[in-house]
Amino acid sequence: MGRSKKKGPYVDRKLLEKIRKLNETGEKKVIKTWSRASMIIPEMVGHTIAVYNGMKHIPVYITENMIGHRLGEFAPTRRFGGHADKKAKKGELKK
């Protein structure tokens, strides 16, 4: 179930303050955040936000297509190590 339209999008208060300050000054610098649940709003377009994935901050450049999505969608938290090698499995079965 999605968030009520009456409430509006959730954006971390401190993140929003930093974005607005950068928009006023016209600066373009990377903003670090741990708020993966924050929704991307039009004010963020053109900025680079470093989203924490549990191990490190992943830089995400915000474009117009991303509006309405969450920041966490663009910073994957899991690494795929690959499937087991078939040759290694056959060797184990013979023993």
UniProtKB/Swiss-Prot annotation:
Domain of life: Bacteria
Gene Ontology cellular component annotations, sorted alphabetically: cytoplasm; small ribosomal subunit
Gene Ontology MF terms: rRNA binding; structural constituent of ribosome
Compositionally biased tracts (Basic and acidic residues): 82-95
Keywords from the UniProt entry: Ribonucleoprotein, Ribosomal protein, RNA-binding, rRNA-binding
Signal peptide (UniProt feature, chain positions): none
Region (Disordered): 76-95
Pfam families: Ribosomal_S19
Any GO BP annotation: translation
UniProt record similarity statement: Belongs to the universal ribosomal protein uS19 family.
HAMAP family in the cross-refs: Ribosomal_uS19
Function summary: Protein S19 forms a complex with S13 that binds strongly to the 16S ribosomal RNA.
PANTHER family: RIBOSOMAL PROTEIN S19P FAMILY MEMBER (PTHR11880), SMALL RIBOSOMAL SUBUNIT PROTEIN US19M (PTHR11880:SF8)
Protein's name according to its UniProt entry: Small ribosomal subunit protein uS19
Gene it is expressed from: rpsS
